Amino acid sequence: MQEKPQEPKVVGVEILEKSGLDIKKLVDKLVKATAAEFTTYYYYTILRMHLTGMEGEGLKEIAEDARLEDRLHFELMTQRIYELGGGLPRDIRQLADISACSDAYLPENWKDPKEILKVLLEAEQCAIRTWKEVCDMTYGKDPRTYDLAQRILQEEIEHEAWFLELLYGRPSGHFRRSSPGNAPYSKK
């Protein structure tokens, strides 16, 4: 009977454990946060399609920016999860079930763009809380994950500001991206 090969020593993980970081807990948090980015991308696709009429049509590009940037966040952090020895669930239904944020369902009154904006805002606020927790968990212990998480956090804060501006007429400093999904902080 042949012995199973020994797992390789991963210095990049070993140094994080020596700094006091619980890798298993971190990977679990990252998988849930990354699942939220993926499900948000999916739901934002549906929400964007329902931004119709004179008022809704102007909101589509902003929703599209947030949607594409969330997909980029998913791709960016997935790489880190695997570097840390983790992985994503093999079943997409399981991925959706473990999401750190609730589903961004299309509201019943979807013909009112403000109702869709409220759903978008709630999703961004959950993402902000989630990525802040990752930043707190990794600050001073895991510079790579911290860097990725804080870049994602900056974009989620921008998304929140956009939706607050649109819902409440609050100044946000929103600027038009050079192209939809051109994430200034987390692009690869």
UniProtKB/Swiss-Prot annotation:
It catalyses: 2 Fe(2+) + H2O2 + 2 H(+) = 2 Fe(3+) + 2 H2O. It is found in: Cytoplasm, Nucleoid. Induction: Up-regulated in cultures grown in iron-depleted media and upon hydrogen peroxide stress, but is not induced by other stress. Fe cation binds at E37, H73, E124, E156, H159. GO terms for molecular function: ferric iron binding; ferroxidase activity; heme binding; iron ion binding. It comes from the Archaea. The keyword Transferase does not apply. InterPro entries: DPS (IPR053475), Dps-like (IPR014490), DPSL_diiron-bd_dom (IPR033921), Ferritin-like (IPR012347), Ferritin-like_SF (IPR009078), Ferritin_DPS_dom (IPR008331). It is an enzyme of class 1 (oxidoreductase). Signal peptide: none annotated. GO terms for cellular component: cytosol; nucleoid. One of its GO terms (biological process) is intracellular iron ion homeostasis. PANTHER family: BACTERIOFERRITIN, DNA PROTECTION DURING STARVATION PROTEIN. Belongs to the Dps family. Homododecamer. The 12 identical subunits form a hollow sphere into which the mineral iron core of up to 300 Fe(3+) can be deposited. Protects DNA from oxidative damage by sequestering intracellular Fe(2+) ion and storing it in the form of Fe(3+) oxyhydroxide mineral. One hydrogen peroxide oxidizes two Fe(2+) ions, which prevents hydroxyl radical production by the Fenton reaction. In vitro, it efficiently oxidizes Fe(2+) in the presence of hydrogen peroxide and stores it as a mineral core. This is DNA protection during starvation protein. It comes from Saccharolobus solfataricus (strain ATCC 35092 / DSM 1617 / JCM 11322 / P2).
